[in-house]
């Protein structure tokens, strides 16, 4: 039997294992220290730290990326582009690296090089929205509008959160032409059209909103309907907001005061059509529908004051449509009980767009009084389309400016050339 001495082999294996372990420890230490330097370089915008990170770990694409990021921050775009190129050679399927390289090349006015980089980003992430979006924006800046919007539509198809931005771009490029914008957006279904309608409503383009709503294949939901009315109202397109809102049972009319005698107990909490709106900040005043006290009809509004009412904010308001350059008489009834106030209550009317005062009543009575009918005239502006009726206080001469007691309000009406609901 031949006996083989295995000891030298075992020793060699052990030495090799130790060497490999030492190498791996050293490599791990170098990579770890490189990553530490990378973090510091990004935090401090330190080029020396970024250079050393690349020196310690030249095969780490993150080190090259960090160096490029620091160089870009310092305006050294040419050097940054070279670092991004090195990173893409090490990790060529990273779409974000290609996007960063493309953006850097564009900073150098190398739009063709930027496009080549973004082509690679799309190649490696063809089903993601962000690559198509970036490429589409670059093509748009290059003046290649048709190609650009093809890419942008792909982005919006992949991720609908891009659709509002697509609509915004199309609106700007089309110079606010709805038909051109629709073509650029590529309206495919009711969801796309509703997104366009919301955008138009935000812009106060009520006529275009109503035109587009007529093209929907399915009835508009109540939620969407109410949202569009709110958007048009907020954009101060009162005429079209009203046209969209007005219930079919009502005949549209200027000067229409809704719920003028408070027969409907609903008080709205946010601005809109259809009744009286209570200002959110005036929540210390108690409002109640009273069936015992009324000027006419079956009910009135009882208002109980317990010490606080901000003169700068109306307690109640209602927006009504009006005709331009026209005089309207506004009448209303009030009754008071033990009403004590440092500044009198008044009824006012303001232009809904400019917030210009159009008219105001005499001071409302204080103390204890029976029902009193008051009236004042206001004249709308040449540009007026809507006005806001407000119940508020006059300015106080002192602070605090208390108010205590009870007032009733009833029969608020525009009495000439109007129809009240």
Where are the regions that the model predicts?
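Canonical positions in the second alpha-helix
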Residues: 52-53, 86-87, 120-121, 154-155, ...
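A structural motif in tetratricopeptide-repeat
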Residues: 56-60, 74, 91, 125-128, ...
